[in-house]
Amino acid sequence: MEDNKLEPAEIVRSEMGTWTHPVYSKYMNEHLENEEYVSREEWEKFKSHFGVDTVVFWMESLVNSDDWEIMMDDCDITKWGPIAPNGFFLIDINFSEDDAYAIFARNK
């Protein structure tokens, strides 16, 4: 896979239910290794670099509050299966400080 090409990859989620696309992970490690968060400007650079559109889903807005609380308390999102919008593919499913999220991308 080319360094500036982001394409669907095999998803093998961890025991906690997390997964990160290897090309996305490499880019973030090389460009934002010591950052606590990604600024809007840096996110736009990422999207431009790969020529993609992205969408982020937050688990709290997609599951009932009881399920959300159980999954967050257990640090286990294996039961959460967000569905990619048409033409999008998963690049990251993980935890933030306050929620879990799934990031999807599609090539422009």
Question: What are the residue ranges of the model-derived segments?
Answer:
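N-terminal "domain-start" segment
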Residues: M1-S65, E69-T78
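Short, compact, well-ordered microdomains
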Residues: D74-K108
